[in-house]
Amino acid sequence: MTLPFGASEIWYAFAFASPSRPRIELYFGSPDADRNESAFKVFEMRRQALEAGFGEPLDFQPLEGKKASRIVAWGPTTHTIMDPAQHPQVAGWFIETMARFRQVTQAFKSATAHQPTAAPLASEGI
């Protein structure tokens, strides 16, 4: 499932890397690899602020050899989609984590329109 970021070529996704590996991600999916790389670098340059605001490490994945890139927050491996009894826990993790992830990444949304070498903006507030 995807949600809009506010730029047509960047979006949020709820996904599973395997049945017991939930993740949320900010996906940079323009058909133009250079645009993805530039937007990804805006966030990568602000990694410390993003992780501090989010409250845990994030996995920055440039996806070498592909056009796209993504930033991932991994869920606990104890949550599995295969066990219906765990569905409420999995859904709760997705909702709570996406709320935090979205809040911290939205603070940097305006920076994606700036040059990727720009210093962090004082208005970013993180």
Each model region followed by its residue ranges:
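Polyanion-binding interface signature
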Residues: 1-78
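Ampiphathic alpha-helical segments that act as solvent-exposed interaction surfaces
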Residues: 45-53, 78-119
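Short glycine-rich, low-complexity/disordered patches
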Residues: 52-70, 107-126
